[in-house]
């Protein structure tokens, strides 16, 4: 009798906290779960879903964007898969609340509660979608596949700040601080991830000006000694911003601090042509992570079956790879997305002449069937 699951395959039981969120969130997460179920069936795993509320839907149900119970249940899971949080800031009653009671405050609190410090944002240009890329054809034709790794908890955004009057002049001060431990842990994570990719790290800083960047560079060099298989380079942030549009194919893993990563990851996302294709992950110093699409809640198309679920499906692939060490399974999801695009299936945001238009559920069906 043929074995259903080949010898040597490790079968796992994993609990995934699922936060569908607001707007298009429930639709796109449902399709990602559909694909995960196909993975479980093919590879013999069991995925248990714990469905939680956060954001506007939690405000409506519980009066707050995030409850202590949701935090506890998220911590008890092996990973978190999330949709999108928030609504129309001009019309939604959620945005008449104080800032710390609005939907996005729940996400900030959850990230802090889960000790998430490393943000991963892949930027991939699929050859099938190269016409959507704003770069020159000769650049887009090469494609690119990079991972921006941004430190989330230190730097300018979390340093001491004040606004005061000095000698009659209003003066604002923000402090950029990093310690060696913060740098070391994000560098280790970057080199670990490079080992799963093309084994190259580009560390981005401003070491010609900033003391914090000089420390950053020193610690990265120390960490690199433990990864002889990984090539690495230092690049100044202004040069990196230029190289992203000049020759994005050169990058594999881009490691950088909080503010630089905030800016560079947005730049990298825009040259792909569609934010509906871009996954995201935030990790702590264990295997735990929160996985979500890079785009917003798109309330204008919510409930209309128009959303592109690919970013969320690719976020689920990242979950498999980085939290569960299921590289083969993650490869299968990414290959299934690739095949759907090669076969001409498109949601409205990436539609072009001659392609096959599908709904949100339609795209999920196609990708799940490709597993």
Region roles according to the model:
Residues 12-16:
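Extreme N-terminal starter segment of soluble prokaryotic enzymes
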Residues 56, 244-345:
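Glycine-rich phosphate/nucleotide-binding loop
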Residues 17-34, 39-40, 166-238, 250:
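Glycine-rich phosphate/diphosphate-binding loop of Rossmann-like nucleotide-binding domains
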Residues 44-68, 242-244:
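N-terminal beta-loop-helix "entrance" segment that forms/cooperates
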């Amino acid at each position: 009798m043929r074995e259903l699951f080949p010898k040597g395959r490790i079968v796992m039981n994993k609990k995934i906290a699922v936060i569908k969120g607001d707007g298009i969130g429930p639709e796109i997460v449902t399709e990602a779960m559909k694909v995960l179920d196909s993975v479980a069936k093919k590879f013999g795993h069991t995925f248990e879903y714990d469905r939680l509320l956060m954001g506007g839907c939690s405000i409506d149900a519980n009066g707050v964007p995030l409850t202590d119970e949701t935090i506890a249940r998220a911590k008890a899971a092996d990973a978190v898969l999330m949709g999108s949080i928030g609504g129309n800031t001009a019309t939604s009653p959620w945005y008449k609340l104080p800032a710390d009671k609005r939907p996005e405050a729940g996400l900030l609190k959850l990230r802090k509660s889960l000790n998430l410090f490393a943000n991963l944002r892949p930027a991939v240009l699929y050859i099938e979608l190269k016409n959507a890329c704003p770069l020159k054809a000769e650049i887009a034709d090469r494609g690119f596949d990079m991972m921006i790794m941004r430190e989330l908890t230190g730097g300018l955004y979390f340093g001491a700040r004040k606004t005061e009057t000095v000698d009659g002049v209003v003066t604002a001060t923000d402090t950029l601080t990093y310690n060696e431990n913060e740098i070391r842990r994000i560098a280790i994570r970057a080199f670990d991830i490079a080992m799963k990719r093309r084994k190259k790290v580009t560390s981005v800083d401003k070491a010609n000006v900033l003391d914090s960047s000089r420390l950053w560079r020193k610690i990265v060099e120390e960490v690199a000694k433990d990864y002889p298989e990984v090539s690495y380079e230092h690049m100044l942030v202004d040069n990196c911003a230029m190289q992203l549009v000049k020759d994005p194919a050169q990058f594999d893993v881009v490691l950088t601090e909080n503010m630089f990563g905030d800016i560079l990851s947005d730049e990298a996302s825009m040259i792909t042509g569609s934010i509906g294709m871009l996954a995201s992950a935030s990790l702590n110093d264990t295997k735990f992570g929160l996985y979500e699409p890079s785009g917003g809640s798109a309330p204008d198309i919510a409930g209309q079956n128009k959303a592109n679920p690919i970013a969320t499906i690719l976020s689920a692939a990242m979950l498999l790879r980085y939290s569960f060490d299921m590289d083969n399974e993650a490869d299968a999801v990414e290959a299934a997305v690739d095949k759907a695009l090669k076969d001409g299936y498109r949601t409205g945001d990436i539609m072009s002449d001659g392609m096959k238009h599908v709904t949100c559920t339609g795209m999920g069906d196609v990708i799940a069937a490709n597993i």
